[in-house]
């Protein structure tokens, strides 16, 4: 196994909140992501590289060993499954909630509750645990439209401020899970590169703790 460490980072908001933590842990990209079309980036450390990919792909890259370490939202990990992954650290960034939601005051109109979501596995598990028969419909965006068009009775989606729900006459209902970004590590890498990964995890943990104290 290569001595090089590959870190897989999620694009977007998670990336912007991860970079300061990495900097506090001593890892900084050698160039600006926004000004490059590269996919694999050098860092200030010669044996550490970064890849910036879609959030949904991070668990796969880490699970299959293409990356040693990754940063992904808990929602993505719940949907993907955690086989082959360690989850040693809650980075406490990109916080939100994974919830059910529906039109204010509306009752289900379908014999089997119709649920629109991109979190198909999460939704199936949740409704089964509640003893509710549900037909889960996979959508990729604009979840709030599904109940308005009578495509679904409820949705399962990420809720941050709840403003989009309210703007469409909807309300959050049941909390499925609290979501934040997590550090995940390939199990084989954790064994073979333990001497490299343990200090990194510890430094990131210290950065998270310092950030928490600053915000208190």
From Swiss-Prot:
It catalyses: 1-(5-phospho-beta-D-ribosyl)-ATP + diphosphate = 5-phospho-alpha-D-ribose 1-diphosphate + ATP. Transmembrane segments: none annotated. Lacks the C-terminal regulatory region which is replaced by HisZ. The keyword Membrane does not apply. Heteromultimer composed of HisG and HisZ subunits. GO terms for molecular function: ATP binding; ATP phosphoribosyltransferase activity. InterPro entries: ATP_PRibTrfase_cat (IPR013820), ATP_PRibTrfase_CS (IPR018198), ATP_PRibTrfase_HisG (IPR001348), ATP_PRibTrfase_HisG_short (IPR024893). One of its GO terms (biological process) is L-histidine biosynthetic process. The keyword Cytoplasm applies. PANTHER family: ATP PHOSPHORIBOSYLTRANSFERASE (PTHR21403:SF8), ATP PHOSPHORIBOSYLTRANSFERASE ATP-PRTASE (PTHR21403). Its EC number is 2.4.2.17. PROSITE patterns: ATP_P_PHORIBOSYLTR (PS01316). Disulfide bonds: none annotated. Catalyzes the condensation of ATP and 5-phosphoribose 1-diphosphate to form N'-(5'-phosphoribosyl)-ATP (PR-ATP). Has a crucial role in the pathway because the rate of histidine biosynthesis seems to be controlled primarily by regulation of HisG enzymatic activity. One of its GO terms (cellular component) is cytoplasm. It comes from the Bacteria. Pathway: Amino-acid biosynthesis; L-histidine biosynthesis; L-histidine from 5-phospho-alpha-D-ribose 1-diphosphate: step 1/9. Belongs to the ATP phosphoribosyltransferase family. Short subfamily. It is found in: Cytoplasm. This is ATP phosphoribosyltransferase. It comes from Chromohalobacter salexigens (strain ATCC BAA-138 / DSM 3043 / CIP 106854 / NCIMB 13768 / 1H11). Keywords: Amino-acid biosynthesis, ATP-binding, Cytoplasm, Glycosyltransferase, Histidine biosynthesis, Nucleotide-binding, Transferase. Its main location: cytoplasm.
